[in-house]
């Protein structure tokens, strides 16, 4: 959409929190999703600049819009201007190494951005004929993920978990491992999460050289934040702003891009708030009636084309650990892989607390990953499943009442469970243990040795918080000498 040369000016007629009703001249109503701007001064003489997005046409030449920033200081009767186009954000190399808000304005206090090109945040998804369908595995260096829930290049992966089980830490580790190992660029969308986490992430990226603070355009990542303290309009649209930047790198620069979204649940939550403010009737559990459409509009744009790919890793907060809640349940339908985090494993001190039986991936097929990988993964899962079945018997009768074969299964399952833990680079400051990147070949070799019984003589503590199996063997020998 091209902005009209003739300025279309209306008047604010009502303000209810972040929702603004405006009246325009007859025949000049703005379109749905057009950006409206309000400029003026408040009662204290300070300059105001608020951007809104049209959501409803009310009749009587009035529209209802949702503000992307606070509406403090706005009054009825102020002029409101139709820009004639949707909200647009900067795209291209100028975005790298910088932090933007939902409107594409820099918020890192590093001066203006040299913007050469902008792109609207509302765009159609790529056509079916343009999509790339060849499945390729994406190595992350995290044992439990690479073995049991391999990620797809150009796929969508969800990190599901309740509060405090480690979603953001895993996401930061993936950024660290992949952005450093992977040649392409990344875009991080911080949707409705803690401001402190956003600040920590930025500083850690400078330390790990993912962001070059002296020459931002040499950086590997662009950051777009709409944090918890932002109005719901900003939190609802910041995911689209981040995605628009990622799409440019895919479609124009023809690169493989990584898109991190933390947290997709907050995107749904913001949509629910906006829906209520617009007066729509709520649906199941109080969510917006347009939940499926809202999630679909975002997810369908995250895909691989013949020009390049967007591999998306999305943290999904699970309210009250209930995976049947409409927000995580709707997100599930769009994903190629689900990494489910378990509070039970976190309480045992096993990090990353990935549930090896609850997590899934469409890539875990023999014709994609190969017979060796597939066989090892399934053997690990069946051993852990048998251990889970035996836990009730162990709790009532004790280990001694099990058969010799079952005792051996329990012993190996406990070693597998501990070997699925791993020290992270981003957690070094908390744990004091150096992080480890483990290749897929080393991961498969390690689990095969445990399953074959080659390491039955080692104590299970040797397998806890190590990288490769060679480290576990060395640690075991040291513990034996003790």
Curated annotation (Swiss-Prot):
It comes from the Bacteria. One of its GO terms (molecular function) is ATP binding. Pfam families: ATP-synt_ab, ATP-synt_ab_N, ATP-synt_VA_C. PROSITE patterns: ATPASE_ALPHA_BETA. ATP binds at residues 161-168. It is an enzyme of class 7 (translocase). It catalyses: ATP + H2O + 4 H(+)(in) = ADP + phosphate + 5 H(+)(out). It is found in: Cellular thylakoid membrane. GO terms for cellular component: plasma membrane-derived thylakoid membrane; proton-transporting ATP synthase complex. Its main location: membrane. SUPFAM superfamilies: C-terminal domain of alpha and beta subunits of F1 ATP synthase, N-terminal domain of alpha and beta subunits of F1 ATP synthase, P-loop containing nucleoside triphosphate hydrolases. Its EC number is 7.1.2.2. F-type ATPases have 2 components, CF(1) - the catalytic core - and CF(0) - the membrane proton channel. CF(1) has five subunits: alpha(3), beta(3), gamma(1), delta(1), epsilon(1). CF(0) has four main subunits: a(1), b(1), b'(1) and c(9-12). This is ATP synthase subunit beta. It comes from Microcystis aeruginosa (strain NIES-843 / IAM M-2473).
